[in-house]
Design a protein with these regions (language model features):
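C-terminal motif of bacterial Sec signal peptides marking the signal peptidase cleavage site
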Residues: 15-18
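Conserved alpha/beta-hydrolase
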Residues: 163-177
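Bacterial signal peptide processing site
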Residues: 20-22
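Primarily recognizes the serine-hydrolase "nucleophile elbow" in alpha/beta-hydrolase
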Residues: 196-273
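Alpha/beta-hydrolase active-site loop
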Residues: 179-200
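A domain-start/cap signature at the N-terminus of enzymes
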Residues: 33, 41-124
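Short amphipathic alpha-helix adjacent to the substrate-entry channel of hydrolases
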Residues: 151-166
Length: 274
């Protein structure tokens, strides 16, 4: 359904900008988009649900070490970075993640070395949420399908979410230089690893949401429309993602998602030609 929606929106934009100035042009465009949708449908038909999303959880990765949290006092946030979310990463400079948790969701003890040992506090609230009900946000900042750098410290871009009581997972991911679908594969692996830590860290693992704009919006849309798709199984196996857990998100926020690249190119060419 998402594919048809994106294709329809893109076609409508073309017609509004004047690409359909003649009936023949509009008919040709409609036929082309329809054919594309049918081809994509047949390509994915029968692929079904990922076999890696059900059954017993299997991984050699450890769960998050609750004795290694760092603390940002200005924003009252506990965080960890450099967390490996796959066993056999293709690019270790990207394939780690950070997690950022509102301070009230933790009961913490200072280790005296810049780290804190934390346990989950289920009674405190931040906004409308507790540690058990807090949504988990996965930002996708990949303009032009670029790579997303793995966080190395406190990430101030997460502050609006954490101030509202949400948990934020910032996952480094490969970009277009690595080829598709590397970026989405990495993000799926990070979501799987996050779910693997259910009950260990704060956050409602049934309420994971991705968000992004432009190329990031496109990859957020893919996360939303390909949850637990078997099409990604081979790629997830290749990097050693956690199995036996879901990579589906509850929703995806997609601002200006650039998805239907062929039609977008046609629109640019038509406008530049004027």
């Amino acid at each position: 359904m998402f594919k048809y929606r994106f294709l329809s929106v893109s076609l409508a934009l073309l017609l509004l900008t004047g690409c359909g100035s003649s009936a023949a042009t509009a008919a040709d465009s409609t036929a082309s988009v329809s054919d594309t949708a049918q081809n994509e449908d047949s390509d994915t038909a029968g692929t079904g649900t990922s076999a890696l999303s059900t059954g017993t959880v299997q991984t050699n990765l450890s769960q998050i070490d609750m004795s290694k949290w760092q603390y940002d006092s200005d924003n009252d946030v506990y965080y960890q970075v450099g967390i490996s979310y796959c066993e056999t990463p293709a690019d270790t400079s990207y394939e780690t993640m950070g997690i950022y948790v509102p301070g009230k969701y933790m009961t913490a003890k200072d280790n005296g070395d810049g780290t804190w040992t934390c346990s989950v506090n289920t009674t405190e609230k931040v906004g409308n949420y507790t540690a058990s009900t807090a949504p988990v946000i996965v930002p996708v900042n990949t303009p032009g399908y670029a790579a997303q750098a793995a966080p190395t410290g406190y990430d101030s871009s997460t502050s609006e979410f954490t101030a509202a009581g949400m948990v934020v997972v910032v996952a480094g991911c490969r970009g277009r230089d690595a080829g598709a679908p590397s970026g989405v594969t990495d993000l799926k692996a990070a979501i799987r690893y996050t779910r693997y830590n259910e009950g260990v860290i704060p956050g409602n693992m049934d309420s994971i949401f991705s968000e992004g704009m432009s190329g990031g919006g496109a990859q957020s849309a893919l996360l939303g429309s390909t949850g637990d798709s078997a099409l990604y199984d081979a790629y997830l196996k290749q990097i050693g993602a956690v199995t036996g857990v879901s990579d589906a998100v509850a929703g995806s926020m997609c601002w200006c998602p650039i998805t239907n690249l062929d039609v977008a190119d046609e629109a640019y060419e038509w406008n530049m030609g004027q």
